[in-house]
């Protein structure tokens, strides 16, 4: 006797349908996940994991406590004994850095991430601005798409103001990336904002009632998983430091550590970096950067989105501009005059709008053991940076800030402007 078709289909498809229904319920039904443990937050703060950068839950839990955003890219991963996270831990500072960034994260990613932060209003942050972000083509599509966060995009759209030039520019810029094509409603909502129109009722309902809770639940479920655990590395580094914070003593120690770890090359690059990343490529790297320039780039307008977000949240921010390893620049032909023009343009954009806390280290690239490799701060560089970070974060509450935002920084004219006359 043949079994009914319905029973056969149910046996085959029933479990799948039940699984789909359960997952949908898990994502859509409103309920609260438990708060992350202190150990998880501490691990996340130094993990530099993509799911933490793309998420909101753990970062916002940390911001409600004594964590301070340290925003940047790959330089934050150079965790020697003088890294900000190590110094804060060893010397029992009243703050703990929460590292927001990894290789490839640039201004547009940070704009969405900072925009979604809560508990940062009226507080301080530190942001490392690398000249290398400001390439002629701007952030690569693959880089941005890797860090794309549906949760952060939903937060932006639900609060976007179509009358704001900043939000209209952000929408136009975001539409240039393939990741924003993945959800038709999100794409159409971006087009509305870009055109100066508010979201339709249907778009708002979908984002608020479907997309937002689903993204929040996914974030709460998965942002705590697969965290890199850099805490043992920080603990080990902290043990190498003296118990008393004395700048001269620490500078001597940083010099000795740098000397011990840069013995196999003439550029003062860390030994393993030189061996793994540079040595076999030396012939083709010589003179390879002679035509590079960071003066003209869409990144300047992406940076303006970050500045606008800091201003909206009344945050006081210390910007750090790192140097280039001078010996390496001489070998590759990188024009350090061009670097100074880039820095001039960056500082003009910051300071004319009231972002006056700028630590310019760009001329320190020839200092011994200042850099860990070609473009990343190390040993003595971290220590010099700490001489400004430490007093800046004596209190994590922002002083009253009065920014004077200028929409000209969203224009192509500014993106392509030279640094002449900006001093």
Curated annotation (Swiss-Prot):
The keyword RNA-binding does not apply. The chain crosses the membrane at residues 13-33. Residues 1-12 are cytoplasmic. The lineage of its organism: Bacteria, Bacillati, Bacillota, Bacilli, Lactobacillales. Belongs to the DltD family. It comes from Lacticaseibacillus rhamnosus. It is a single-pass type II membrane protein. Keywords: Cell membrane, Membrane, Signal-anchor, Transmembrane, Transmembrane helix. This is Protein DltD. One of its GO terms (cellular component) is plasma membrane. Pathway: Cell wall biogenesis; lipoteichoic acid biosynthesis. Residues 34-423 are extracellular. Involved in the D-alanylation of lipoteichoic acid (LTA). Could be responsible for the transfer of DltC-carried D-alanyl groups to cell membrane phosphatidylglycerol (PG), or alternatively of D-alanine residues from D-Ala-undecaprenol phosphate to the poly(glycerophosphate) chains of LTA. D-alanylation of LTA plays an important role in modulating the properties of the cell wall in Gram-positive bacteria, influencing the net charge of the cell wall. GO terms for biological process: lipoteichoic acid biosynthetic process. Its main location: membrane. It is found in: Cell membrane.
């Amino acid at each position: 006797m043949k079994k009914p078709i319905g029973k056969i289909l149910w046996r085959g498809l029933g479990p799948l349908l039940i699984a789909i229904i359960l997952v949908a319920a898990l994502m859509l039904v409103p309920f609260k996940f438990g708060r992350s443990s202190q150990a998880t937050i501490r691990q996340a703060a130094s993990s530099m994991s993509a799911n933490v950068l793309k998420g909101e839950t753990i970062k916002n839990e940390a911001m409600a406590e004594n964590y301070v955003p340290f925003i940047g890219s790959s330089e934050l991963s150079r965790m020697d004994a003088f890294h900000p996270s190590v110094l804060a831990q060893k010397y029992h500072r009243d703050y703990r850095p929460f590292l927001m960034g990894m290789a490839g994260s640039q201004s547009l990613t940070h704009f969405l991430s900072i925009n979604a932060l809560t508990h940062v209003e009226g507080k301080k942050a530190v942001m490392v601005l690398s000249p290398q972000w400001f390439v002629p083509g701007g952030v690569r599509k693959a880089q941005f798409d890797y860090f794309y966060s549906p949760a952060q995009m939903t937060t932006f759209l639900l609060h976007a103001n179509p009358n704001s030039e900043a939000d209209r520019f952000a929408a136009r810029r975001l539409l240039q990336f393939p990741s924003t094509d993945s959800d038709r409603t999100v794409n159409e909502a971006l087009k509305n904002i870009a055109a100066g129109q508010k979201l339709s009722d249907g778009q708002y309902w979908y984002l608020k009632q479907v997309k937002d809770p689903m993204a929040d639940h996914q974030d709460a479920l998965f942002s705590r998983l697969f965290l890199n655990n850099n805490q043992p590395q920080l603990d080990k580094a902290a043990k190498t430091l003296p118990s008393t914070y004395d700048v001269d003593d620490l500078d001597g120690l940083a010099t000795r550590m740098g000397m011990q770890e840069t013995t196999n090359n003439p550029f003062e690059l860390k030994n393993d970096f030189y061996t793994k990343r540079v040595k076999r490529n030396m012939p083709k790297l010589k003179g390879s950067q002679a035509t590079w320039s960071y003066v003209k780039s869409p990144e300047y307008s992406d940076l303006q989105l970050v500045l606008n977000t800091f201003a909206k949240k009344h945050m006081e921010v210390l910007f750090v501009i790192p140097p280039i390893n001078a010996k390496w620049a001489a070998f590759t032909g990188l024009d350090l005059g061009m670097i100074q023009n880039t820095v001039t343009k960056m500082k003009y954009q910051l300071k004319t709008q009231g972002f006056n806390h700028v630590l310019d280290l760009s001329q320190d690239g020839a200092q011994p053991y200042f850099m860990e490799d070609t473009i990343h701060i190390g040993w003595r560089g971290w220590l010099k940076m700490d001489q400004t970070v430490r007093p800046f974060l004596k209190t994590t509450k922002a002083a009253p800030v009065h920014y004077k935002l200028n929409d000209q920084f969203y224009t192509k004219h500014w993106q392509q402007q030279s640094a002449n006359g900006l001093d």
